[in-house]
Structures are given as structure tokens and as C-alpha cells.
Amino acid sequence: MSRPRLNIDGDTLKLEEILQVARHTVTVELAPAAAARVKAARDLVDRVAAGDTPSYGINTGFGTLAEVRIDKKDLRELQRNLILSHAAGVGSPLPLPEARVLLLLRCNVLAKGYSGIRPETLALALEMLNRDVVPVVPERGSVGASGDLAPLAHLALVFIGEGEAFYKGERLPAAQALERAGLKPVVLEAKEGLALVNGTQAMCAVGTLLQLRAEMLADLADLAGAMTLEGLLGSHKPFIPEIQDVRAHEGQKACAAHLRELLADSALVESHVNCSKVQDPYSLRCMPQVHGAAREGLSFARRILEVEINSATDNPLVFVETERIVSGGNFHGQPVSLALDVAAMALTQLSAISERRVEQLVNPALSGLPPFLAKNSGLNSGFMIAQVTSAALVAESRVLSHPASVDSIPSSAGREDHVSMGMTAALKGRQVADFTRSCLAIELLVAAQALDYRQPTRAGKGPQAAYELIRSKIPTMEKDRELHRDIAAVSALIDSGELLNAVRTATRGQ
């Protein structure tokens, strides 16, 4: 059965389409108009390479060695040496989904027609993607300008039959992986090595998947907060439209609307309508303001990433219309670095306020429930250490939220004297997302135990659906047990999408 097809043209790629490629569920093809642009740019590079005029990256050295002229007979060796010398990454390989996206994003940049790649080299890249030949790319070694040189060099190694690649998940020498897939390596011609290694695609590969996950976690944070609110018999009034309209931040309005949707048809809110409590703590009452600010930060990051993945970030750039090959700075990752720092800070705020809500749940002076929600407390410790784990994750997330985008270490003998550290921002953002997911899993688990004490009165549509799904997998804690298993089980419901899907079905009929 044929798979759905995704045409790339360098201009219209969407974040959601990237997720399909990460999961290897579509066949990627080059749009005809893009193919024509690629050929025209290559023809111009060939004309320049045949002449005697110096042109960076075509017949010169690289970086600080740009003033060194290269003889025509050595142009192929120049490109090969570039790939070999720049493949200096260290650390664990990018996970397969991120490495697939890296290859896709490089193809999309080449499809714009400003890089001067040969059509047959781009065709090899697309065939690798479609036949599941995924380069082994160490995740550390990029300072984010001139783009992600080391990660992209490891990607390019496979094109020339060097390095390593995964073929259908099996790690192999690149030449063997290509052979198994029925592909042959290429010999790089003038400028092609540079066309493969200059750009921000590694930070964007990690960053786009981080962004999509962060947006999911923002929805999950609203759900966890709503579930805690119901478990604590909190008020729905702070979420009414009138309060949001007089401040009018879009993120705040979106969060409040989502909370109202989740809490609809709550019997619990009616059960304490005449209680003496006047106000809830900030971690409950101010969810629209805090979660909403995080949403706005993520909206900013999305806008930057949507532009970046469809941008020409090579250097030099090939302008066919004016027959010029011009050096510039589009490889500099500062926009992406700043955006991913903001995304990490947004996620850290979601985990920080979640941890405070867990404290509300387990503290009997605040919840009116048994200490740590334990039955026969004293003999049982209940969720005491779950809150400690959440606090530890928040503390580490705060350290990781120090912005990478304000750091810069000059390189290349001072020629590259300001860099973005965009890959650093992406990698630490990915870690923060992991921690945020775990914090929210803990809150959902603890909130479910609180709702046990409120049964049979039903919570709002969203929390009730989440509660019922969690309880179908994880029983009420009657006595102490290994909590890490329960946290992992809730995390699995989150990662699979099952939890949010169940909630959306209950609240929207989707």
C-alpha cells in the first residue's frame, strides 16, 4: 500500500508535516518548480567553477582560510575534505525522528534553489529519507554559526559513503546502509560540500519536534491544573470571559477558554457553592495568566521556526536572476536560539506552577484531605516523595532555562566571532520538555488520588475523562507501592496521545 506523499518546495513546509516525516509515514518528493530552480542554480555554479574568478566555497578555502585559492583539479577533494574535517561531533546520536527531520529540513533548504547543489545529490538525499537510511549524527558540537557545521557534516558523510547510518533502525557503516537500500554514494562537485553543511537545520530538527511537544504540554498543563482544581474543590470563577477581556492577552484568553471547556458540567463545583473560601491560591487562580504567558512564548517560537524551516540559510547564496554568488550571514542561528530559549522558559513555568499545585494536593493544611493523600497515613507515606521528585525536576529545569542565546564563544581564528549556541538551546529545551512531561504526569497521578476522595460526585468533562482513563490503567493507592511505575504509566498515556485524545473526545466530541 502506497504511503501519502509530501511535496517539498523550500517555501511551504509546515511543522505538522515535519511530524509525519519524523514518524516515517510519508513519501517525500521534490516539487517540479523546485527541481527547475535547483538545476538553474547548479548551472550557475558550474559556470563559475569553470572560470578563474575567486568565489568562496567553490574555488577557495573555508572560514579563515577563505583567501586560499584552490586549483581546479582539486575542487572535488576540497569538498570531500570539508565534509571529513567538519565531522567532529561528539555525544549520543540524534534520535531517529530528529535525524530524519534533519535530513528533511536540509532537503527543503536545497529545494529553494539558492545552494547550488546538483539535482542528483538532492535526489540521493530524498531517496535516503524515503528508504529509511538515516545518518548517525552526534548531537553535540555545534555553536550555531556558521550554522550547525558538525552535525550537518555527519549527515553529509553518508552521501559520500563515509560515516554511519541507520537502515530500517539498524546501525551500519554508511556504505553498507546505502547498498542495502539500493543506493550509491556520490562524488561531490564544486560547492556541494558547503551546500550540505551550512545552515540551521540541526537546531531546527530538534527545535521543531520540541515545539510540537511543548504545544501538547501546554494543553496538558491546563488539564492537570483543572483536575487539581476539582480535587481541591476550587473555584471556576477566575476563568470567566469578563476577567480575561479586561486584560486581553491572547494566551490568557485561550487558556481560560480551554479551562472552561475542560470544567464544563462539573458537579463538584456545585457541591461546594456555599463554602466559606473566598479565593484560591495563585497556582489555581492564576492559571490563565501563567499558562497563558507560556502559550504566548510558544506562539513566538512557532512563528520563528515556521519562517526558519523555509529559509535559505546557506552561504554563499546563489542568485540565478542576477548571476551572483554572494556571501552573507543567513546561517546564523540567533533567531532560532532565542526562540528555543523562550520555549524552554515557558515549559519551566508550566512545571513550576504544576509542582506548587502538587504541594496543594499533598499538604493537609491546604487540601483538607489526608496527609499526602495516603490511606492510613503514617504507616503509609502516600505521595510524599512524588512532590519531592517534581521539585527536583523543576530545580533542574530552572538551571536549564539559563538562556543559551546570550552566550557566544568566538571560533575559526576569530572570523566567526559571534555565534548563537542554537543547538545548545535546542538540546536543553528537549530536556526541559522531558522534565515538564514528568512533572505533569505526577500532578495528574496525584490529582486522580484526590478525586478518589470526591467520588461519586463527578468532575468536569475533561478531568473526569482523564480520571477514568488513569484509573483504568492505575488503581487507587490503597497502600504504599513503587510510585515510579505509576508515573511511567501516566507518562505513557501522555506520550501516546491517548490521554489528551480521550479528553478531547469527552469535551469536543472529537
UniProtKB/Swiss-Prot annotation:
Chain positions found as 2,3-didehydroalanine (Ser): 146
GO cellular component, one term: cytoplasm
BP GO terms, sorted: L-histidine catabolic process to glutamate and formamide; L-histidine catabolic process to glutamate and formate
Pathway: Amino-acid degradation; L-histidine degradation into L-glutamate; N-formimidoyl-L-glutamate from L-histidine: step 1/3
Matching SUPFAM superfamilies: L-aspartase-like
GO MF annotations in UniProt: histidine ammonia-lyase activity
Localization: Cytoplasm
CDD domains cross-referenced by the UniProt entry: PAL-HAL (cd00332)
EC assignment: 4.3.1.3
Catalytic reactions on record: L-histidine = trans-urocanate + NH4(+)
Protein name: Histidine ammonia-lyase
Domain of life: Bacteria
Native organism taxonomy: Bacteria, Pseudomonadati, Myxococcota, Myxococcia, Myxococcales
Enzyme class of the recorded protein, top EC level: lyase
Residues in cross-link 5-imidazolinone (Ala-Gly): 145-147
Post-translational changes noted in the entry: Contains an active site 4-methylidene-imidazol-5-one (MIO), which is formed autocatalytically by cyclization and dehydration of residues Ala-Ser-Gly.
Key word Lyase present: yes
Pfam families: Lyase_aromatic
Family the UniProt entry places it in: Belongs to the PAL/histidase family.
